[in-house]
Amino acid sequence: MPSSKRTAAIIVAAGRGLRAGAGGPKQYRTIGGRTVISRAMEAFCQHPDVFAVQPVLNPDDLSMFNQAAAQFRYRPPANGGATRQASVRAGLEALAADAPDIVLIHDAARPFVTPALITRAIDAADKAGAAVPAIAVTDTIKQVDESGAVNATPDRAKLRIAQTPQAFHFDMILDAHRRAAREGRDDFTDDAALAEWVGLTVATFEGDAANMKLTTPEDFVREEARLAAALGDIRTGTGYDVHAFGEGDHLMLCGVKVPHNCGFLAHSDGDVGLHALVDAILGALADGDIGSHFPPSDPQWKGAASDKFLKYAVDRVTARGGRVANLEVTMICQQPKIGPLRDQMRARIADITGVAISRIAVKATTSERLGFTGREEGIAATASATIRLPWNDKGRDT
């Protein structure tokens, strides 16, 4: 049953994440073919009980964020502070003019948050005022002194691992953050600790072991392997396209502008290589063909750049929780010569799709002067795509 409380979410994404390596903020690294922050935001942006999502960013990351979150609706990002605590306060202040009843505060570095966990967070905050998701500690914990010697063994039955989203009545947590700022306290590692400091009782609710925080390079390696293992529904598709030559001074081939003594006769830019790849991906999805998604009778696609079509097809895979594993396209033509352009074309396809260039093949052949390609009347292209989708015991993607 939908909640009657107005709920907003703050996505804390201003940190640098240097321990994760890779030379940039970890929230913009990809995992399973998608950025960490995109995965973290999706469940909140699509949750029926969350009316607003407030990102908090380092302003230097704005262009990366805009690209990663392009498919979502969210409030204008707030600028983060020098600490996580300062960043959360910035997000709370950004929401204050249209204050929600409940606010969920979530770390962007936890990309596997689920709608069910969000619902539990809202319910818990509604009942308790302040609540955190928690999971039981299964290992024995040792407390050590300055030398590293064990001096205590806490009772693990009384210990919990706190996660996010942490959920609060909005006014309560905003007041707590403002008080901490006034008193110069900026050392709280999560919002529950700050709430405890001002005297609030913080409840716990069932967390999710999969809702882990990505911190180290090893975390990324482990989660990549876990995601890959879950994508057991391996599918292939094929595509074919052909366009005749017409007037012009260049051809678009696999996203590359190739000078030539003619152009293509086509409704869009006529890129036979990308069109064949689009059909291959859609075929693997059993999701129609390029003509059903971009009908030539629709004037909005007149002269359209075909990279839009290919990006759309890849996004269809991503929307179903999958990834593109391999792409191959073969150009059939006498001219132009594809060999000198091969790596440029592979790089362009990689840029459009987000697929590693090592998983993209561009090949070429001729028809030995036979048929319309042999007479240099046009170009044909064939393509294949391999995709991986989530599998369940009924053989359907989830």
UniProtKB/Swiss-Prot annotation:
Q: Which HAMAP family match?
A: IspD, IspDF, IspF
Catalytic activity as recorded in UniProt: 2-C-methyl-D-erythritol 4-phosphate + CTP + H(+) = 4-CDP-2-C-methyl-D-erythritol + diphosphate; 4-CDP-2-C-methyl-D-erythritol 2-phosphate = 2-C-methyl-D-erythritol 2,4-cyclic diphosphate + CMP
| MF-aspect GO terms | 2-C-methyl-D-erythritol 2,4-cyclodiphosphate synthase activity; 2-C-methyl-D-erythritol 4-phosphate cytidylyltransferase activity; metal ion binding
Q: What does this protein do?
A: Bifunctional enzyme that catalyzes the formation of 4-diphosphocytidyl-2-C-methyl-D-erythritol from CTP and 2-C-methyl-D-erythritol 4-phosphate (MEP) (IspD), and catalyzes the conversion of 4-diphosphocytidyl-2-C-methyl-D-erythritol 2-phosphate (CDP-ME2P) to 2-C-methyl-D-erythritol 2,4-cyclodiphosphate (ME-CPP) with a corresponding release of cytidine 5-monophosphate (CMP) (IspF).
Annotated region (2-C-methyl-D-erythritol 4-phosphate cytidylyltransferase) at: 1-234
Q: What is this protein called?
A: Bifunctional enzyme IspD/IspF
Q: Tell me its cofactors.
A: a divalent metal cation
> Which positions are annotated as binding a divalent metal cation?
241, 243, 275
Organism name: Nitrobacter winogradskyi (strain ATCC 25391 / DSM 10237 / CIP 104748 / NCIMB 11846 / Nb-255)
**Family assignment?**
In the N-terminal section; belongs to the IspD/TarI cytidylyltransferase family. IspD subfamily. In the C-terminal section; belongs to the IspF family.
